[in-house]
């Protein structure tokens, strides 16, 4: 639809090509334009709020001051298309292409195995590319900063950082940039396993073929468009206006035009970076008829330095502010830069670099956000705001009155913020900033603070004091009364005590404060004051500002400089962020193995380069189909209610709306009895799908959902927590129970009995590609083509078939690749596919359904939260004789996979321990939350934490090291599990012993103890955990697989199998198998997709057996084909593969074969409590060392050593990637990830802004992974005796949790507190309970 007349022409460049647009809608973002209008789908959409980095592109503008183009990384989802006039945009397609030339950045991230599912990879590439364009030889600190705004759920970041490090000037690992030795060959502190000349000479550590990297030459990059240079240099910048259907965008060309516009439209918001307005518009549907962009006003970006301070234009970005501050700090005396240094420190943690490149100083100040990092510092630093209007200019203070929104101290109608003046600090003045956040990077603070003190010269007497906090109210809060009462005091501990009392009395945090966590925030108020006190003492001790004749002796006689002991220095330091290092060890292939045989070699993910160039096609990258419609879902806003009515009339009148899909439109089955596709009579949770809107565009569909009127009648009870469910006896299925021996009798014959509780929070899958599906109805025979992001296309096929009441053979489901799954794209994706299919049938047109991040998190469920209770009886030696564990999981409102999860949890609960008397019981609770579902590990990560917590408690009670108690209770010899399945624990002991040796646990524990004795405010902890993970489904039918292999007459081979590529590299492994069996190179082999039309009746790709079963099926097909070719090959042994294939065709020999693997026998009899539910086990061990900040609860991961039993690895690089990714995902579960719900059951932590998965800064500083040598791993069960590693590494992340617990115990010992403490129920494992536990 054409927009109203009067729009100007928008001119910008994309990948070197000029783009001219007249009818520009101000509501369209750069991301939408790139994907929809230009077809540049390499730029991905994952969150819509600028917080995940998948849509990162490079934005270049000509800077008049430096006479050079400025290249920055930005998130395209936040950039309004209207804002691009005069800019050049570079997407991943513009960096390099497989069809033309792959750029070194793209090549290195792929060859470094830095890509798994590949959905985040284009964003990673663009962040690295923008960094190199600005800093051709970056430092490692700059590398980490550049990637802080990019999220990855698969890899664990280590290989991505490794690829970036190859460009760094200060990197010297493994021979790069002039290093003479590999780190393996250098003597050190035990970081690396024994060297190549030692007992592990058959082990290999080279995952990255650095010698194959093409060099990078910065002089060969594309030039900035000369036309844009001329536009920037034009002395007259015209005003630009762009009109859309609902919004008009005006970009004035001069300050006078801006002020006049502001006077006429004082209510219109000013938009610079769109980092606040954009996400609000997306999440809240907030629309402003007029938007004013002052980005092109030079006066608003002017920087002036005078003798009294620094004046910075309001439109300067936060990234530019960092550069401005760095320059001033380097040029000015130290005493003048106190406020500047505090600001510079705070800026390093504000959002990600992409957002800092967009967000403006003025926007940050004027937002008055509660969680502001800068406003507390600016307030205490006595910053002033230069305001301007048509009536003139005025100056106001950024003080408590401005922050509180007092009218006389704020902007008046028609005014704008022109600049911010930051005064230079004075002699004897000290300014510091503080923050504590859920994550070290790219996270809003729980609490931030700015504090300033000025002393009477030559004394310790407080002359002026200012304290401000963010995160404790609706805006930045100051404490003027407390500060006033402390004036004239000396800087002593008595003053500190008084300050804490006064501040806690003045700065009150209401229980209903945004974000809650009142007790934790009050702890931080005091912690920051204490840290401020010590930092000022440290500065005074250094006599930094003293000049003759003023000396310490001329100070007041009532006070002397204290000599800060070294032990106190730990309280002064922030937790540092380091680029991780480490070694990845795996077994070399047999020297006798033919070089063309790829099995056992670290082959790059076969889609790696396509991921890195943006050429890998995901579901929503498929081109728009003729007459395609878009679907958006209408979901419940009540947790438990009767649906009185659904009125779509208003929605149907909106432009573009084609239909409303309700349960009445379903021709077949509406889901199951307890799990409806579309709600009918009542809703059971917030987020349950009621109906769907189908419209011409996705924007129209989403906007129309708010016009569907749903009337409810609330029902009781509303059950949200496990404790509520227990109280209401609200359960989804019968109790699952296993027993061994006689626990009651055993409890009578022990030295000690302990009882305890364990809480494990929920976890969001947070696959980078949200749920999405495209349904295309065909014109005859009720046929449908479905293109989906799913782990289980056969299940989607069945669900759609039953929903539409058509045979399975009319429904074909296609899966090219999936942008991460982790269990979340098994059952729930089928539900979405069925709803979209109903829309397609009703309208007779293709329907595309793509969930945004908030919708995905709201609807699809995640990992089951757990509440566990244990009773353990043990001897003084630490030997456990009896153990009784009761587990409850929060299953949500319907059954889904909850019964299977509780079964698997109970079956695997014993972990690595042989305890003669056991009783395990488990219940799945029914609550009014969205149904929780399958998730990597399937209950084991929650359940195993219970038994390991029990072991830790036993060790504390006995005064023994936890690893000694673990060893004492481990399986020793071939034995039977609690469910009476025999296995050999030999690989478990090898992993455990290897881990202890490589990590040097005794030596490092001694060093940690010595550190702890000297450091009251920083504590270190070490933990080692073993793992026995049973692989597979507990049902024989789920272990079967099929394959189809075609050999074409040119010798090329097409392989199809029933597994789905989720990022785990299953397609790569399958081609390695086919290459070995057919004896042809990988370059002749290809996998196109997974389709229910080629391989029917497939099993979900899950339970870590995808490569096992599909590998056997591919092997079977290839062996069939090779057997057919053998007579021809024997007749012509010198012939080529192509000649043999051609001869077979001439002799009418079939060159197509199916393969089939019947699977493993697996069963479980719950009545008898016995069976053989799993075909084999994966074993492993992990040791982690952490350091915690006792004042804030923050931690740093110093080192992790992992040893995994991978059998005979098909591809060590892929398997190590699975281990590292699972480990970090597990560390996230146990330490950073939090799901919060309102009392009404609404999800509060939706999207990456609130829900924090691990970032690159969360990787251990030293991360060593070893795949156990496979000498004794031969088994006929799996393909080439390999083992599935997709899930098992998840639990090893708990080693971080227990290391933190060990450090907290050390801190509590110092303070005379009990060591055996219970982690609070709220936010188990995050920094909040750790801080409170120490306090």
From Swiss-Prot:
Active-site residues annotated for this sequence: 1287
CDD domains the record matches: fer2 (cd00207)
UniProt xrefs under PROSITE patterns: 2FE2S_FER_1, 2FE2S_FER_2, FAD_PCMH
Residues binding [2Fe-2S] cluster 2, per UniProt: 117, 120, 152, 154
Subcellular location: Cytoplasm
UniProt-listed Enzyme Commission number(s): 1.2.3.1, 1.17.3.-
Cofactor note (record): Binds 2 [2Fe-2S] clusters per subunit. Binds 1 FAD per subunit.
GO cellular component, one term: cytosol
All residue ranges annotated as the FAD-binding PCMH-type domain in the record: 242-427
Reactions catalysed, as given in the entry: an aldehyde + O2 + H2O = a carboxylate + H2O2 + H(+)
Tissue: Detected in kidney, Harderian gland and olfactory mucosa.
Binding site for FAD: 270-277, 351, 360, 364, 373, 417
Main location: cytoplasm
Sites where the protein binds [2Fe-2S] cluster 1: 47, 52, 55, 77
Protein keywords: 2Fe-2S, Cytoplasm, FAD, Flavoprotein, Iron, Iron-sulfur, Metal-binding, Molybdenum, Oxidoreductase
Known function: Oxidase with broad substrate specificity, oxidizing aromatic azaheterocycles, such as phthalazine, as well as aldehydes, such as benzaldehyde and retinal.
Family label: Belongs to the xanthine dehydrogenase family.
Name this polypeptide is given: Aldehyde oxidase 2
UniProt source species: Cavia porcellus (Guinea pig)
